[in-house]
Amino acid sequence: MEVNPPKQEHLLALKVMRLTKPTLFTNIPVTCEEKDLPGDLFNQLMKDDPSTVNGAEILMLGEMLTLPQNFGNIFLGETFSSYISVHNDSNQVVKDILVKADLQTSSQRLNLSASNAAVAELKPDCCIDDVIHHEVKEIGTHILVCAVSYTTQGGEKMYFRKFFKFQVLKPLDVKTKFYNAESDLSSVTDEVFLEAQIQNITTSPMFMEKVSLEPSIMYNVTELNSVTQAGECISTFGSRGYLQPMDTRQYLYCLKPKKEFAEKAGIIKGVTVIGKLDIVWKTNLGERGRLQTSQLQRMAPGYGDVRLSLEAIPDTVNLEEPFHITCKITNCSERMMDLVLEMCNTNSIHWCGISGRQLGKLHPSSSLCLALTLLSSVQGLQSVSGLRLTDTFLKRTYEYDDIAQVCVVSAAVEVEA
């Protein structure tokens, strides 16, 4: 009859402890009225308690610190630190001790050991200590694998390992929204506004040290999270930078294409990379966490084959007096165009000049500026409409209405600059 051999005990003992900051000790005050049976007994006990504050014994918060009593929570972006100790519990010398610590995630296995060299020998009641650090960059299940190999005095090679499983939680809920800016000319521009909503989903407050947007090479970014008062820059969130549990903050950024990219039509179209958010915070006793989002992408607005934008237009004009506007025509297609400009009058707007004139050939991603003259025969807020561009190659006409608005006043009213 086959009998399973007894499990062999190892000469070395492995201890693993997570290193975290201590917490403030809290005591529960127990008091009573002076006329009650205990009298001043409870008050005297609280005064003699070393964990209380002199003169404020009834407050729960003391001046003493306590070491962590459990593993606690680990959040994404924090640094996981652990103390590993291998102790020789036997009465003999152990040789060639190798301690290896690996962290297994859902996607990779990382070696966290500071040194992969074996220790020549370990005498009785001696130990080998190591401290490992790792910035957590994935959520979900993590397994710390600690393996120990050594050789006994009899030359027998021994090996054992232990597994420590823990969960990495998400500390912040980040949501982003993109808004396409509209200029004073009532036309969509290349500027983009990014709204980032950041919510603290942990159980403790956070100090938001930094929330910044790192733009891609195509954009320049302007933070809109502060105001200037009396020459001093003040945060829109006030002087306190704390984010309480389940509270949300909204950060706003304005992105504008760099000049070398904005002048090239067709580059900023379709799905474009905006950049990524870099968030740094601190929790109790200054423990720092950092989180970087993946590259944020947005769908750029489509302009069709030909884009018409206004470079200059007055806000207010006189009734029945000509005024000038400057248009910019951009070929957003990948082919050559031969354009003809037609100007169609409306009930209130009348174009001055020759309609049907040739603008010439326009290469892909090229632009041309065009000065036009028009007048209005009706007072009030009038919409500029009636421009038509025809590509003679494909016999295709592009219509542009409501491209801007002007305020038309009587000539007797002084127009302010």
Curated annotation (Swiss-Prot):
This protein's name: Trafficking protein particle complex subunit 13
PANTHER family in the record: TRAFFICKING PROTEIN PARTICLE COMPLEX SUBUNIT 13
Signal sequence residues: none
GO cellular component, as recorded: cytoplasm; TRAPPII protein complex
Assembly information from the UniProt record: Part of the multisubunit TRAPP (transport protein particle) complex.
Taxonomy, superkingdom: Eukaryota
GO biological-process terms attached to the record: endoplasmic reticulum to Golgi vesicle-mediated transport; vesicle coating; vesicle tethering
InterPro entries, per the entry: TRAPPC13 (IPR010378), TRAPPC13_C (IPR055428), TRAPPC13_M (IPR055429), TRAPPC13_N (IPR055427)
Family affiliation: Belongs to the TRAPPC13 family.
Pfam families: TRAPPC13_C, TRAPPC13_M, TRAPPC13_N
